[in-house]
Amino acid sequence: MGQSSSISSSNEEGSSHSKKFTNSKDILAYFNNKAQQQVTIPELVSFKGNLQIEDLNTPISHKALCNSLYFPQNHAMIVGIVTNMLRVLSNFPLMKSSYEPITGYGLLKCILLLNRARCAKFLKTKSYDQLKLLFISLSLQKTDKEELSEESENDGDKELTIKQIITGFDDVDTEMLCIPADFMLQFLTWLLILTVDCPTTNSKLDNTETHDQWGNFKVSALNLLRTMNPDVVGDIESHSITFQQFSTAIRTVMPNLLKPLENLMEHFFYLQHDLVDHDTNLSSIQDSKVMTPALLAQLSTGLPKELFIHKLQSLYIGRKSGFSMRSLQAKVFKWMAPSILVVSGMRITNSEEYAAEKNPRYRHFLEEFPKLKESDQMMDASHLNKRKTTFAVYIDDPWKVTNKDYFGDLNTRIIEISPRQDIYKVNQKGTIYFNTIGGGIGIGDKQPLIKPASKRYIPGNVSLTFDSTLEFAVFRNTGYGGSLDPGLLSMERKEENSPYELHFLIQDVEVWGCGGEKELEEQIKQLEWEEAESKRRQQINLRSLGEDRALLEMAGLVGQHQGGGSM
């Protein structure tokens, strides 16, 4: 790969960080030039070619920007949200007090700032709060921006170093900002669609099919929205998202949420003929009612992204094979690689009434399961007001019958998917049982006490319990003390000791194989090779232009007092 076009040495870098600035024009010029130095010559050629510009000072047209970002048709709100975000970022580091149209320089800064690795290199700091910058860019609207006053333009007394400029966020107080919940919902929906459509930095984009499923992805996006603010259960327009809610949710339970946006922005560095086809998981999940593209996208925000590089293998679908332990065992137990168990159903809101009047089998289940008292439960608004309940369990070990002992390694975890997202990790090995003598399935439980005339479940402090007929399930969360820790989100919010229990009537149970380590390693190598091959073609294409200096000058890469960088 061609080297960066930067010509500054480490000594020069150090001296520039200590340099002081007194006006906005010099600050913007410094960061614009620094942005250009961060990219390679092939990347810069592709960038200018995609936008059809010769000079980085050229404003980018709205049409060119929309075409490059593959926005869904008839979704004006997401177009406005994202283009506004880019306008704010393009004026970095003066997001509040300076406003200019998006130029080539500005868009180049957007790409760097939205990429975690590039951002750290661009700003020469690994501790920079990238989430705060993104939140500011989403919450500052065009009408909020302040025009530079004559006083601020001529304020030569205030001297700022690079570090002060970067860490000051242009004096924007995030405590005073919020993002309307309906705006955030649109943004999250778009990100989930990108998770499916844009899995790599160099994948061809053809998002017509997934854009047609906007409504399905919106349902999953609502789960993520309620993860940020659990009070969003009714009128979305009356709610908003604070920076604390935004940052906490992403850092704890959806760390991969922004990766697709990174991938999309990196597409500016590839010409169309350098992109490659990438097979998605969509073909393997066509027959599923639960493992939809939208749910798969949501899962990938919190689980290791490597799990979703290869196609998922359908092992057991209850609606097809029947809801029974025997059917599940016959379909799943020969799979020797990691798997994901997904269960979905409707929460039983009034247990006593439902047991007495609607389902005598549930009354029998309550006699065997020690239910928490209603007075002891502390549910948030999302659990109280939303009945749809979905959980996934990632299981690294092969399944096996365990009527007395347990299986499952330290990678086992329960993921709450709906009505909000949280992740519950094990703190010891051996947390799962598959009991074929009437005990059902338990994650985080003790083995049930089974006698000829009675049965007693022993739920763990954090646990997911299935009855032996796969008709009922219970998720319990009463804090520390069990083989699973409280949810990552709950612990971050200091809510781990707020007990609650979700009883639900199972509507779907599915098990999906994730592929073995060998297959995963091969597919990761294939993706890395494809990306390297795309970059190699970039260099070859650029070399073919090398004989025509006029073309390079037109691209702004040589001449015009530039060294041209290194190939």
UniProtKB/Swiss-Prot annotation:
Its main location: cytoplasm. This is Restriction of telomere capping protein 5. May be involved in a process influencing telomere capping. Pfam families: TLD. GO terms for cellular component: cytoplasm; nucleus. The keyword Nucleus does not apply. It is found in: Cytoplasm. Residues 289-515 form the TLDc domain. Keywords: Cytoplasm. It comes from Saccharomyces cerevisiae (strain YJM789) (Baker's yeast). One of its GO terms (biological process) is response to oxidative stress. Belongs to the RTC5 family.
